[in-house]
Structures are given as structure tokens and as C-alpha cells.
Amino acid sequence: FSSSLLEAFNDSELLFVMGHELGHHVYGHHQIPIGYVLRGRQPPPADLALDLFAWSRYAEISADRAGAFCAQDLESVARALFKLASGITDERVVRFELHEFLAQVDDMLAFDDKPGQGAPKQDWFSTHPFSPLRVKALKLFHESDLMATTGMDKPTLEDQVHQIMSLMEPDYLQGKTDSSRAMRDLFLGAAVVIANAYEGISKKERD
């Protein structure tokens, strides 16, 4: 935490940030050193490498839920994610609108109408979901029986979150054909190159 963060975030937003970081600790996310695994002398199989990136994105979703439970206010949670992602904390510069943020995900889902194509390649190697996806997943979390007594059940929640998260995943993760395996091998090499080029996954991404 920095003094600038304390000054720019209100109490509910800070509760989300602190709860998110505590969630990482409680769930043991730091026990899987993704950067170290990718840069090791024995690179992992392609399937595992892609799964690690996907796992990291889901780890962020679970930590977000811990933060959201602490904050108990979706608007504050979404605004905190916007501030963290954009670096813009002054509403005189840009005013955050939750419905516009969520509409970005609806647009992405509507555009994703080509079965078998999967997400753009650069998205596969991201350790964090896009902020609009995180906010959409948190909206679903707030609408579930984990947060509301009459909300959707957990299996339905997870199914809907998986649909959103698939926007950043390649179809090759599930493919069993020789071509799918070849593509996984190819993109494993790209993942290792990316990790080495940037001297591994940054501390911010590991957190």
C-alpha cells in the first residue's frame, strides 16, 4: 500500500483491495510460482503452461471474491478495479460508469460468435483477466447465493463465470487432435520467450 492509494480510494474500495490481497494469502495462490516454472531448465508441457496462465486468471477471480465479500458493495469494487487498471483516480478526469464497464463484456460476448477460434493469442499469456471481465464476474458473484439469500446457486455461477473467462482462453486447451497438440507446443515456446524477455512474471503479476 502507498500513501497515494490511501488518499485516492474510499473506505469500501480499500476494503476490496485489502480483502483481495488477503484472499491470495488464504487460498495459497503464491505457492505456485508461475514465472519460475516457465523459466526453468525443463520447460513444462504446453498444456500445463497454458493451464498455468488460465489458473492465474482464475486465482484473481477468487481473490476478487474475497475482496468483494469484505467491501459488500459492487459499485465500490468495480470502481477500485477501474482505478487500479487505469491509474485514473480523479473523477474530474474520467467518471466511472458501472453499466458502461459491464457493457464492454456483453459486446465481447456478442462478438465471440466464431466457434473454434478462441481468444487472441496475446490474451492466453496474461496472468490477470481484463478488468471488465473481473467486474462482470463479480456482478454474478453478488447475484449468487454466496452473497444473496435468493441468488443463483454456485454451479450456475461457476458456469457463467467460465463462459466469461473463456474469452481469454484458446480452444486448443481442450483440443485432443495432433494439430491442437502442435499448437500448444508452439505457444508454450512463445510463453517462455515472453517470460525471459521480461525477466519472468513481474511482482505485480505474481501478487
Give the ranges of each region predicted by the language model.
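Catalytic Zn2+-binding segment of zinc metalloproteases
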Residues: 5-15, 22-38
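Divalent metal-coordination and catalytic microenvironments
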Residues: 20, 63, 130
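Active-site-proximal gating segments in proteases and membrane effectors
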Residues: 44-55, 68-159
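Conserved phosphate-handling catalytic cores of large alpha/beta enzymes
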Residues: 57-59
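Amphipathic alpha-helical segments within well-ordered protein domains
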Residues: 64-68, 191-192
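Non-catalytic terminal regions of proteins
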Residues: 131-207
